[in-house]
Curated annotation (Swiss-Prot):
An individual GO BP term: potassium ion transport
Membrane-spanning residues: 13-31, 36-58, 73-92, 99-121, 161-183, 376-395, 405-422, 442-464, 468-490
Assigned keywords, A-Z: Cell membrane, Membrane, Repeat, Transmembrane, Transmembrane helix, Transport
Organism of origin: Bacteroides fragilis (strain YCH46)
Lineage: Bacteria, Pseudomonadati, Bacteroidota, Bacteroidia, Bacteroidales
Name of the protein in its database record: Uncharacterized transporter BF3802
């Protein structure tokens, strides 16, 4: 039975480490699916499974646990950054600026409440432990990792701050969802009215491609080429088909328009009225009845060399006599403006003869198999640059130690930049949603399992004989006070839609369980929009905040 003894208890055995992690992750993920009052902890339960195993003496070599913890965290934050990168900078436009400002308010108030409790209690809770409680209260795991990284820089040897995190986390989830419910009852929210208001708001802000058939009835443009008209009008549109004297063909910039010519036009909704008024009138045309065999087909961009190129640079109209009318990216239709930058994973609508469309397909790739192949080089180039970025010391006046983004902040920043600007460096940033989610989940469960196993030895003693209940109470106050204050301000002063506010609260705390609750409460996508708008900045600030507190005050 020596083999079993070695498998279960030898902390230096590779088999023991793998066996322990496999059990902790499997048990944690399974138990995390159990719903309590309609809310499940999800993969976060892996932390508690790790604590349980650590409490009973199952552990591993400290250096191995540390490596797995940090590598898991790197994978997690990098995949998050890669996913939110394209929307990070655009989230500051229009209403996104207000939402992000409110999210910053929540982050600042969380820190203010935590520091107030720290001074009120007169140092009964050590500063590193209070930071752990802060991150448990706001359910932000990457921030905990960044704080631990900062403590490593300071050679901290006190109690595991993950104990404070684990104590505060459960009521943190409850408090976030509770604040969402509280705001609903404070303002007596009518779900049906909120959904109607949201639909009215989004109808006016979504710039989808507008398709229409027009008949030429403006004497001023008779005999003019399509290119001349487009330049004079100054509003971008695509004319994919023209019916002239009963014959349907594909027009180009040199096509001359005459009276009663019929055009199939694609443009943005806000430009449609001006284009109709300038060309003639809108008519109903059956474009299926044609004497020239033409097809409309969505073609997948899969060739890396197309990544980052402007649509107009490819000259499809002049080279292949086809028109591209719209581009679908991540489920959203975009107007095919010549300045639109194509990315791997885009689906372009091509109109032309079947032979020409096939030639365009060969240029763009149109290979689903190629799209499903993992772009490993982008992942590891990004991690390499992220660690380099995270290791650079940034000196601030008055701070005893330079700040570093660390193993959490560095990869996150680089991933956001690659997600947004990677196509300009011809880096293929496209990853299937399932692949991104798989890597992300593997990363977070490895991190949580490591933190739990390391903290487990002292957890029960801390809760029963130590200040565990005090940690829980402090965590709940850190959670609930800022959310109620900002929730009331957002609703009463800024008139934020309640469903959007749900996403704001969940996103500012980077809390998936709260988002899941919000999505269940409404059929609208408003919570997801609010969540994704504030998530990148909130995550970035959460990761930096703990480091700044520790480096400034220790």
């Amino acid at each position: 039975m020596d083999w079993l003894q070695d498998l279960l208890w030898n902390p230096n055995s590779v088999a023991h480490i793998v066996f322990l992690y496999a059990f902790v992750v499997a048990a944690g993920v399974y138990l995390g699916k159990i719903k309590i009052f309609g809310v499940s902890l999800g993969v976060t339960f892996v932390l508690f499974a790790g604590i349980l195993m650590g409490h009973f003496g199952f552990t591993g070599d400290t250096h191995i646990l540390h490596f797995i913890r940090e590598f898991g965290l790197i994978l997690f934050v990098f995949c998050i950054g890669l996913q939110v990168g394209p929307s990070f900078f655009s989230s500051f436009k229009k209403g996104g600026m207000t939402l992000n400002m409110l999210a910053v308010g929540i982050v600042v108030l969380n820190i203010a409440v935590a520091m107030a409790l720290y001074f009120i209690l007169g140092g009964r809770i050590e500063l590193p432990m209070m930071v752990g409680i802060l991150y448990g209260a706001v359910t932000n795991t990457p921030g905990l990792g960044a704080a631990q990284e900062a403590l490593n820089q300071l050679s901290y040897s006190g109690p595991q701050i993950a104990l404070g995190y684990a104590c505060a986390y459960p009521l943190g989830v409850v408090g976030i969802i509770g604040s969402i419910i509280a705001v609903r009852y404070i303002f007596r929210i009518n779900f049906a009215k909120e959904e109607e208001n949201w639909n009215q708001e989004t109808d006016g802000t979504h710039h989808k491609p507008h398709l229409m058939s027009l008949e030429v009835h403006n004497e001023a443009i008779y005999g003019k080429t399509l290119g001349t008209i487009s330049s004079f009008l100054g509003r971008p549109f695509v004319c994919s088909r023209i019916r002239k004297n009963g014959h349907v063909s594909i027009p180009n910039h040199g096509t001359i328009l005459e009276q009663n010519d019929q055009l199939f036009v694609v443009c943005s909704e806000e430009d449609s009225d001006a284009i109709v008024a300038f060309i003639g009138r809108e008519v109903q045309v059956d474009w299926e009845k044609q004497d020239m065999p033409m097809v409309s087909r969505r073609i997948l961009v899969t060739k890396p060399e197309i990544n980052g190129k402007k649509l107009g640079m490819l000259n499809f109209r002049s080279m292949y006599n086809v028109n591209i009318t719209r581009v679908n990216r991540s489920g959203v239709d975009l107007f095919a403006n010549p300045n639109l930058i194509l990315q791997v994973g885009d689906r372009v609508m091509v109109v032309g003869s079947e032979d020409a469309v096939e030639r365009v397909a060969s240029v763009l790739g149109n290979s689903l198999k190629r799209l499903n192949e993992p772009n490993i080089i982008t992942l590891f180039v990004g991690i390499f640059l992220g660690i380099l970025c995270g290791s650079l010391p940034i000196a601030f006046p008055g701070m005893p130690t330079p700040v570093k983004l660390g193993l959490a902040g560095g990869p996150l920043v680089v991933a956001i930049l690659i997600g947004r600007f990677g196509h300009k460096l011809h880096l293929v940033t496209y990853t299937t949603q399932s692949a991104n989610l798989m890597i992300r989940e593997i990363g977070i469960v490895l991190f949580l399992a490591s933190v739990g196993i390391e903290a487990g030895a002292n957890f029960v003693d801390t809760v029963i004989h130590g200040d565990g209940l005090l940690y829980v109470g402090c965590g709940f106050l850190i959670t609930i006070i800022p959310l109620l204050i900002i929730g009331v301000i957002a609703r009463s002063y800024y008139k934020i839609n309640y469903f959007m506010l749900m996403g704001l609260i969940a996103g500012s705390n980077t809390d998936p369980p709260a988002l899941a609750y919000s999505n269940q409460a409404t059929g609208s996508d408003a919570p997801a929009v609010g969540y994704s708008t504030v998530y990148p900045l909130s995550m970035f600030l959460r990761i930096l905040a703990g480091q700044m507190i520790l480096l400034l005050m220790m």
